[in-house]
Amino acid sequence: ESAHSIRFLYQHFLSGITEKSLNVFYYACSYAKVDYSRFMNTTVRITLKLIPDSLQTQPVFLCVDDTMVSKFGTKFENVSKLFDHAAHNGCNYLNGHCFVSVMLCVPAWNRDKVSYLSVPLGYRMWQKKESKLELAASMIRQVMPEFHSKDHVVILCDSWYTKQNM
């Protein structure tokens, strides 16, 4: 299940680990001068610690993807006309936002077999001033120092990400 809002996160998680009110989190998200990109680094460090010793030599995967979110109104900030190659509705364009995301997949044991846990690290909303490739590269550069002890970090992405230097 995805987190739909700050309220959802508060009701299902944050209220169980702190006595702070919901308004504190609203305020922090709105006004605090926080470098949220550092959360990606912290998430990587915590996730890498979850890998069992017996699987430390297995590769980890950084997955990069983009996704589009349709908007039906016209007054949304940064809304654009986007090409949707996967559209099956007769029109390859939609009005909306495009997000580029990075996810970390780490090995874990599942019934005596290796399976991979997927942990979202971060996402950025694409705007015309910066390409999706530049957004992806920026997020990858942000987290790569956390992998200094890993020998096998594989980046997985759609083929068009490799058309230019990342």
Task: Locate predicted features.
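Conserved, well-structured functional cores that handle cations and Mg-NTP chemistry
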Residues: E1-M166
